[in-house]
Regions:
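Buried, small/hydrophobic-residue-enriched core segments of structured protein domains
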Residues: 11-17, 26-165
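N-terminal functional module of multi-domain proteins
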Residues: 6-8
């Protein structure tokens, strides 16, 4: 056994006695500026350290990159579509949430939309295109089924041909 049973019982009953102070979410922060302060008994703080660094660090990274994209879009809406490439389903929800905080207008992640009130948007799947004899037929069928909100996924085969279709 890696850990002694007494320590595992301690962890099962552990309730951290810490205070956490942080800047408001979405606030601009510069390098080497403290974002979060955790105070309490050393053991309590150390047991929380890795989880806090993981959660805060990852979502801060995503929000920073997203804010740059939103700024480059110059007022045009930006949609988040990261679920297919995210590190696990919970990572996809975290990415959607952090992107929304950073200025994305919507997400393709239905669970994140439901959980956090983020507007949901999206396209058809690549499998939709693959289920038709040609890409153009798939696009026409999707446009007919979604005439008021049609966004086509153009990279199933070849992006240039997708744009032409």
């Amino acid at each position: 056994m890696l850990f002694k049973s007494g320590f595992l019982r301690f962890l099962a009953d552990f309730r951290p006695r810490v205070d956490i102070d942080a800047i408001p979410e979405g606030e601009l922060v510069f390098a080497r500026e403290p974002m979060v302060r955790v105070t309490g008994p050393m053991l309590d703080c150390q047991l929380l350290e890795t989880a806090l660094l993981n959660i805060i660090g990852f979502q801060t990274l995503v929000a920073t990159k997203t804010a740059r994209v939103v700024q480059a879009a110059q007022g045009r809406p930006v949609a988040e579509f990261g679920l297919r490439r995210a590190q696990g389903p919970d990572g996809g929800v975290a990415v959607a949430r952090a992107s929304y905080v950073a200025g994305c207008a919507s997400t393709s992640n239905v669970l994140a939309g439901r959980r956090y009130g983020i507007p949901v948007s999206g396209t058809h799947a690549h499998s939709w295109v693959l289920s038709f004899p040609t890409e153009l037929e798939a696009f026409r069928a999707f446009a007919k089924s979604s005439p008021k909100n049609c966004t086509l996924l153009i990279d199933t085969y070849d992006v240039r041909e997708g744009v032409e279709n």
